[in-house]
């Protein structure tokens, strides 16, 4: 019966809701998931998360594009950038988060383009356009008030999308955009050349966020991209915010990063004629439930797993896996050697403690949260 249902889903050409029970949807943010068709030689469905304020709209629309994790894109989780979602919902936006072809439950295969980074971005932007074509046909969408945002590979996709000059898209926001390709000769120079090429065809302004301890793109890499983009006529304001935590690449997903990007983004939105100020009537969307984040301690460096108390080799190996998970995240330990971690919303702190306490005899405590250690010795 399940096989038949899946076949029917593939045959359907309309955007199809997925069952909430399968996805742990956040009802407080009106979260839903659709499979949106992308028409071509073959129709493929793109897994897309939608968050909307209550009411009929029309709402301004923001697309948030995801990055690319290490490994097979099919095993990448559905992207849920809830910090950004809350920011935009409070300002009355409908938030659309598409998973591109070959990622998570989206159909098709990831098309990398080899070392042709310019082509890579253009292919990714094609998937985003298919989703936006669907969105702009909905009565709740304000087709004249739209914004494109992206993080990491999604930031690169956002810059590539700018070349389409899609009607109603007023601006682009790029958080640490690019794609690191160590296997390609002079890949940093390739990024800069492609950025300049995108700029020549882009008519809308953009806002860029990059830090100086980014594990993917060093300072000279992002400065070269920005120089090439603006040198080719692109409108791009660079917010170079210096160092952030142990890896500035995580700024957009980290709670501590909000104070860096939110004020800058609010000013930028107002400058391009988009809603920038939070509305008091929508304040409920800004409330974050769950455990409070403990204060950072100086017990140990974040990446020094040798200092973690109690755990054995398996726990230290688990901690290494934890450090590769996206923020928000948390890692918990217990005196008997039990450990557990969780990443993503909702409330990774509580979920990491729950995972640890399956064997921790209710004695688990948090060792690390997000990008820092919170452990205190008794």
What do these predicted regions represent?
Residues 171, 177-237:
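The feature captures the conserved acid-bearing segment of alpha/beta-hydrolase catalytic domains
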Residues 232-290:
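C-terminal catalytic histidine-bearing segment of alpha/beta-hydrolase fold enzymes
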Residues 58-67:
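Short beta-strand element of the alpha/beta-hydrolase
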Residues 140-151:
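Alpha/beta-hydrolase fold nucleophile elbow
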Residues 103, 279-378:
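Secreted/extracellular ectodomain signature
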Residues 69-81, 87, 97-123:
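Cap/lid segment of the alpha/beta-hydrolase catalytic domain
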Residues 21-56:
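N-terminal cap/lid segment of alpha/beta-hydrolase-fold proteins
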Residues 116-139:
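Alpha/beta-hydrolase active-site loop
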């Amino acid at each position: 019966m399940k096989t038949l249902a899946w076949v029917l889903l593939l045959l359907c050409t309309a955007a199809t809701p997925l069952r909430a029970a399968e996805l742990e949807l956040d009802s407080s943010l009106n979260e839903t998931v659709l499979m949106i068709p992308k028409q071509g030689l073959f129709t493929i469905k793109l897994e897309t998360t939608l968050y909307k304020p209550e009411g009929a709209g029309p709402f301004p629309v923001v697309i948030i594009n995801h990055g690319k994790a290490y490994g097979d894109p099919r095993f990448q989780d559905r992207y849920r950038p809830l910090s950004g979602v809350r920011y935009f919902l409070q300002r009355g936006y409908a938030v659309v988060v598409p998973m591109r072809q070959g990622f998570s439950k989206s159909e098709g295969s990831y098309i990398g383009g080899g070392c042709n980074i310019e082509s890579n971005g253009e292919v990714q932007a094609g998937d985003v356009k298919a989703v936006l074509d669907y969105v702009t046909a909905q009565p709740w969408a304000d087709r004249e008030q739209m914004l494109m945002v992206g993080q990491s590979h999604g930031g690169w996709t956002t810059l590539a999308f700018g070349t389409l000059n899609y009607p109603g898209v007023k601006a682009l926001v790029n958080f640490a955009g690019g794609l690191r390709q160590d296997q390609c000769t002079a890949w940093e120079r390739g990024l800069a050349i492609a950025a300049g090429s995108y700029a020549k065809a882009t008519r809308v302004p953009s806002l860029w966020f990059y830090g100086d301890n980014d594990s993917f793109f060093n300072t000279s890499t992002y400065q070269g991209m920005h120089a090439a983009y603006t040198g080719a006529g692109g409108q791009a304001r660079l917010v170079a915010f210096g160092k952030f935590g142990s890896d500035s690449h995580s700024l957009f997903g980290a709670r501590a990063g909000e104070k860096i990007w939110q004020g800058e983004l609010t000013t930028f939105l107002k400058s391009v004629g988009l809603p920038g100020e939070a509305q008091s009537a929508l304040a409920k969307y800004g409330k974050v439930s769950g455990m409070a984040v403990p204060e950072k301690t100086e017990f140990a460096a974040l990446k020094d797993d040798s200092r973690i108390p109690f755990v054995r080799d398996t726990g230290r190996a688990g901690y290494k896996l934890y450090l590769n998970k996206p923020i928000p995240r948390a890692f918990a330990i217990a005196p008997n050697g039990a450990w557990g971690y969780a990443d993503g919303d909702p409330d990774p702190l509580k979920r990491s403690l729950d995972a640890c306490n399956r064997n921790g005899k209710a004695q688990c405590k948090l060792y690390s949260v997000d990008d820092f250690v919170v452990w205190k010795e008794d």
